[in-house]
Regions:
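N-terminal basic, amphipathic alpha-helical segments
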Residues: 1-180, 201, 385, 389-396, ...
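Short glycine-rich anion-binding loops that position phosphate/pyrophosphate groups of nucleotides
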Residues: 165, 298-302, 363
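Conserved core segment of the aminotransferase class I/II
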Residues: 175, 351-353, 359-421
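Conserved core of the PLP fold type I
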Residues: 179-323, 334-336, 341-349, 423, ...
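A generic "structured core" feature
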Residues: 221, 250, 255-264, 316, ...
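Short, solvent-exposed loop/turn elements at beta->coil junctions and helix N-caps
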Residues: 361, 441, 482-487
Length: 523
């Protein structure tokens, strides 16, 4: 159908002169507010006349009026199109859903605000928590720069941002084949479709997850201990809503740490207490006496990269047990270990049944799958499932079946082995550059896991890393500073070098650019 016929223009007035003005005004408004986008082809006048119930002469006059004013252009032999550039004095505005004015009503939900409602006035019907700049910045930068399209002219040549993966190396052909096999099996047994969904997650997938985490993370559990989620973020949200009593529950978070996890618990009404980290991970002795929930990345602290030492692991679990607190373990990239003695997940030694283990397939497979999981104590599972059901009944069944087959047939293990080799090479190249070319300014933080390396500023170097990051951006190199991950965005200065999407040539190029910038700006 023609785009013009798909938008809601409202009824066209009757009578030749009235219908002309009515149709003209509505088409002009649709062009100005973007419902008819630049370059949209308008249908022939005969079709428009028939659709809107006017004479063809009326439709012709409307088109000619818009053409004369510069709202549309005519291309010989092709038709009439919405102009790319509107006439002088006219401007396109974002289409906004209007709401009736009145006490407590918002004037518009999106698009530019009216003069009567300045940006400084909060929307009356929105939760004020989500209007806080700290919250919008914590969630905004994290998602926007990963999913918002950017023009080719502004795309980064070298992307050192953390938490990105090299999807170019994912075996899409194998995953498609496995997914098709699983769906064909479901098609042959339609009676099993309902049971294949399951509020707690597809049972075959939960079985496969138990095998996967037992082999890679020494976490031994039953399928009944697993809740399948739409990624790790939904797991954090579920835990926050299940564990937090608004205004009372004290949640300790690593500082610096992962902002979206912090926001999930804050949104549920928790009292957030930032706790520092060092070379051994979370500083356990700094945990508040009244702590109820402790959020930690013990294997590969985000973003600094430290591994929680064995002594601190023992102390952390004992502290949680003695204070009737619980631990949320974020094991976001634990499959990728390169050197050093292996330290198992906290959950693997959880005799006290106080650890909630959060895993994801975003790093070892694809973020687009939106699939994660939560290993929880038996006493909490019923509540967690009920909380999840408030937002969705279950994750995508085809995706769950595809991932289950991918794991069960050994493809995930093979893919992880391949990517571990790829990431190891990139990591070694980065570490060599950090200790060599950049050693005058930066010192890498010892780390054995993951897809990024953090480097702190040496005491002898005086650097404005925020300025350095801005200059690098102008040279098509994207990088994050450590300070942006602190609760108050103040702390030990450093840079984070993600190697998920950069090959060896890009690493060399990015390091060379950074060296030149540091030479000019550092002392």
């Amino acid at each position: 159908m023609d785009p013009l016929f798909e938008i809601d223009l409202g009824p066209v007035a009757k009578g030749s002169r009235d219908s002309l003005q009515s149709l003209y005004r509505q088409l002009k408004a649709a062009i100005q507010d973007g419902r008819l986008a630049a370059g949209t082809r308008l249908p022939p006048t005969r079709k428009s006349a028939a659709f809107f119930g006017t004479s063809r002469n009326t439709a012709v006059e409307v088109y000619e009026k818009l053409l004369n004013e510069g709202y549309v252009v005519s291309r010989h032999g092709s038709g009439t199109y919405v102009a790319d550039k509107l006439p002088e004095g006219a401007s396109r505005t974002s289409f906004a859903v209007q709401r009736p004015a009145g006490k407590g009503a918002t004037s518009r939900l999106n698009g530019p605000r009216s003069a009567a409602q300045p940006a400084s006035v909060p929307e009356p019907r929105l939760n004020s928590f989500w209007l806080c700049p700290e919250v919008t910045s914590a969630m905004g930068f994290w998602r926007e720069e990963r999913v918002q399209p950017v023009s080719r002219a502004h795309s980064a040549t070298v992307d050192f941002r953390p938490a990105l993966i090299d999807s170019r190396l994912f075996p899409f052909d194998i995953f498609r084949r496995v997914s098709a096999q699983q769906l064909r099996g479901l098609e042959k047994r339609p009676a099993t479709f309902k049971s294949a969904q399951g509020n707690q997650g597809n049972y075959r997938l939960r079985e496969a997850i138990t095998q996967h985490i037992a082999l890679t993370r020494a976490v031994v559990c039953l399928p009944e201990d697993i809740l399948v989620t739409s990624g790790a973020q939904q797991a954090f949200d579920i835990l926050a809503r299940a564990l937090v009593i608004p205004g009372q529950t004290v949640v300790a978070v690593e500082d610096p740490g992962y902002p979206p996890m912090r926001v999930a618990f804050a949104a549920a009404g928790a009292k957030i207490v930032p706790v520092g980290v060092d070379a051994e991970g979370l500083i356990v002795e700094r945990l508040p006496a009244d702590v109820n929930v402790i959020c930690v990345c013990p294997s590969h602290q985000f973003p600094c990269g430290a591994t929680l030492s064995a002594s601190r692991r023992k102390a952390l679990v004992e502290l949680a047990r003695s204070r009737s607190a619980v631990i949320v373990e974020d094991d976001y990239d634990g499959e990728f270990r390169y050197d050093g003695a292996s330290l198992q997940a906290l959950r693997s030694a959880d005799a006290a049944d106080v650890v909630f283990y959060v895993g994801t397939f975003s790093k070892c497979m694809l973020p687009a799958l939106r699939l994660g999981f939560l290993v929880a104590p038996e006493w909490a599972m019923r509540t967690l499932v009920a909380v999840k059901n408030c937002s969705d009944w279950h994750c995508s069944t085809p995706v769950q079946l595809g991932v289950a087959g991918f794991i069960a047939q050994g493809h995930l293990a093979r893919h992880v082995r391949k990517m571990r080799h790829v990431y190891r090479q990139r990591r070694e190249a980065l570490l060599m550059a950090l200790t060599g070319e950049l050693g005058e300014w930066l010192e890498p933080v010892p780390s054995f896991y993951g897809m990024h390396v953090a480097a702190t500023v040496r005491d002898s170097a005086r650097l404005d890393l925020e300025l350095v990051a801005e200059i690098l951006q102008s040279h098509n190199v994207k990088i994050h500073t450590v300070t942006r991950y602190y609760v108050n965005q103040q702390g030990q200065p450093g840079l984070i070098f993600g190697y998920g999407v950069v090959g060896l040539p890009e690493i060399a190029q990015g390091i060379d650019t950074l060296r030149k910038v540091l030479t000019r700006t550092g002392s």
